[in-house]
Curated annotation (Swiss-Prot):
<dbReference type="GO" id="GO:0005814">
    <property type="term" value="C:centriole"/>
</dbReference>
<feature type="coiled-coil region">
    <location>
        <begin position="101"/>
        <end position="305"/>
    </location>
</feature>
<keyword id="KW-0206">Cytoskeleton</keyword>
<keyword id="KW-0963">Cytoplasm</keyword>
<dbReference type="GO" id="GO:0120103">
    <property type="term" value="C:centriolar subdistal appendage"/>
</dbReference>
<keyword id="KW-0175">Coiled coil</keyword>
<dbReference type="GO" id="GO:0008104">
    <property type="term" value="P:protein localization"/>
</dbReference>
<comment type="function">
    <text>Centriolar protein required for centriole subdistal appendage assembly and microtubule anchoring in interphase cells. Together with CCDC120, cooperate with subdistal appendage components ODF2, NIN and CEP170 for hierarchical subdistal appendage assembly.</text>
</comment>
<dbReference type="InterPro" id="IPR051375">
    <property type="entry name" value="Tuftelin_GRINL1A/MYZAP/CCD68"/>
</dbReference>
<protein>
    <recommendedName>
        <fullName>Coiled-coil domain-containing protein 68</fullName>
    </recommendedName>
</protein>
<dbReference type="GO" id="GO:0034454">
    <property type="term" value="P:microtubule anchoring at centrosome"/>
</dbReference>
<dbReference type="GO" id="GO:0005737">
    <property type="term" value="C:cytoplasm"/>
</dbReference>
<comment type="subunit">
    <text>Interacts with CEP170.</text>
</comment>
């Protein structure tokens, strides 16, 4: 009689659930046990087939010999019983014993398959729990990242609005400076024209004064023109006063012109500074716009709902246990 004892260790369910982080090792262990059970079943089938072949061949031979021997003895003495005739009953008992052993082996095999199914379901539950926790952690982290990105986006938007407001103010200041500069330029042009007219008038008065002085010299040489000389002297004095006053006005206008030119130079320098500030603000606004677009893209990607699947254990057993708990099946077999 051949006896095959199958021993396998099934990890406790509570330990597998507590060590869900080692689900990869559990899956490998389940697959290894599955392959081991398959090998055992194949071996048992081969043993059973071989045992039946040997027993049938041996029983057939013994049966023929016993039948022939019993026939010969029966002719000699019908009342006497040959002990070899009882070998058939013994053989039948052996066959029944083998059948019982095979039945026990099959039952053990079924128990192993049920335990394997229970272990596989426990591993699948552990995998689902781990996947669920990972998914929840991912959702939490994604929400935190999305919130940070939203805060950064709002902060960038506020900074952008502030920069745009400053840029607008600087542009207005620049326009005002440009208007003042244009006014100063017009004022300078008017002052230059006024000074030119005054210079021309001054030259005219000087020429008239010189002409009167020459005429006065000519009249002084003659004593008969005393009254005319006095009139000429009076006119020359008036011209001199006009020339002096005109010279004072021209000097004042030159000072005003220099002052306006200096103001214009200051406005030009201010205009250059405003241009630089506006250019810097435009660069900052462009940078903020680029960062804002990038954050919008990141927020859009983060807000998309990820599609996740919870992994399930793959069935590697031929045992059909749909709708029935493995533990209930194990209890039924033990009864």
């Amino acid at each position: 009689m051949t006896t095959v004892t199958v021993t396998t260790e099934i990890p406790p369910r509570d330990k597998m659930e507590d060590n869900s982080a080692l689900y990869e090792s559990t899956s490998a262990h389940i697959i290894e046990e599955t392959e081991y059970v398959k090998k055992i079943r194949t071996t048992l089938q081969k043993i059973r087939t071989q045992m039946f072949k040997d027993e049938i061949r041996h029983d057939s031979t013994n049966h023929k010999l016993d039948a022939k021997h019993c026939g010969n003895l029966q002719q000699g003495s019908d009342s006497e019983m040959d002990p070899s005739c009882c070998s058939l009953d013994l053989l039948m008992k052996k066959i029944k014993g083998k059948d019982l052993q095979l039945l026990e082996m099959n039952k053990e095999n079924e128990v192993l398959k049920i335990k394997l199914q229970a272990s596989r379901e426990a591993g699948a539950a552990a995998l689902r729990n781990v996947a669920q926790r990972l998914f929840e952690n991912y959702q939490t982290q994604s929400e935190e990242v999305r919130k940070k990105q939203e805060d950064s986006k709002q902060l960038l938007q506020v900074n952008k609005l502030e920069k745009e407001q400053k840029l607008k103010q600087h542009v207005e200041n620049l326009n005002q400076v440009a208007e003042k500069l244009e006014e100063k330029h017009s004022q300078i042009t008017e002052l230059e024209n006024l000074v030119q007219r005054m210079e021309k008038e001054k030259r005219t008065l000087l020429e008239r004064k010189l002409s009167l002085e020459n005429k006065l010299l000519q009249l002084k040489s003659s004593a008969t023109y005393g009254k005319s000389c006095q009139d000429l002297q009076r006119e020359i004095s008036i011209l001199q006063e006009q020339i002096s006053h005109l010279q004072f006005v021209i000097h004042s206008q030159h000072q005003n012109l220099r002052s306006v030119i200096q103001e214009m130079e200051g406005l030009k320098n201010n205009l250059k500074e405003q241009d630089k500030r506006i250019e810097n603000l435009r660069e900052k606004v462009n940078i903020l716009e680029a960062q804002n677009k990038e954050l919008k893209t990141q927020v859009a990607l983060s807000s998309e709902t990820p599609r996740t699947k919870v992994s399930k254990a793959v069935s590697t057993s031929e045992l059909k246990t749909e709708g029935v708990s493995p533990y209930l099946m194990l209890i039924r077999l033990r009864k």
